[in-house]
Amino acid sequence: RQVIPSQALAKQYLQDVLMVYPGPVRVSGHSKGGNIAVYAVSQSAPVIRNRVLEVYNQEGPGFSQEFLSDPGYVSIVPKIKTYVPQGSMIGMILYRLEPIIIVKSNQTGIMQHDPFSWEICGTQMLRMPALTSGSLFLQRTLENWLAGMGREDRIRMVNTLYDLLTSGDVEVMEDILQPKSLM
């Protein structure tokens, strides 16, 4: 399993913080930071994982199929709260075991990735009953593409897709098929 540098750094940072802070903690991240937060907690020693009350993943991509059977990851699944907007794109990349919590965004397309567009009432995010058809289409398409690829091709494809979705050239699903950068 390939570990990206930011994941290793986050794991070390979490360990360093918990050496000086004695209490329980909540760990959180948005986008790639959400993936990194989940990784850091899951790959830490059990004594550290036990001090983490919850891991908040705000529309971070998931993990490879192989990672889903990692004992550290499996042990923290009940602690993970993954939030995605109803038209999620980034959060549909790769796989996860934890259920997603779908929240209402006042934006469309990739602009829903901005957590400041997620609607709240009081102290709660407004929930939506389901993902949009476009988000579900992206999820199914990615699963089909990834299933037919070798490990190195999957890594390249996921990195390229993430870069494309976060480049600003994608506003709606159709832009993925015809990115402005390729025209």
State where each predicted segment sits.
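Alpha/beta hydrolase fold serine-hydrolase catalytic domain that processes acyl esters and thioesters
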Residues: R1-P24, A45-M183
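Gly/Ala-rich beta-loop-alpha elbow adjacent to hydrolase catalytic centers
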Residues: S28-G33, A37
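Short glycine-enriched nucleophile-adjacent loop
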Residues: A37-P46
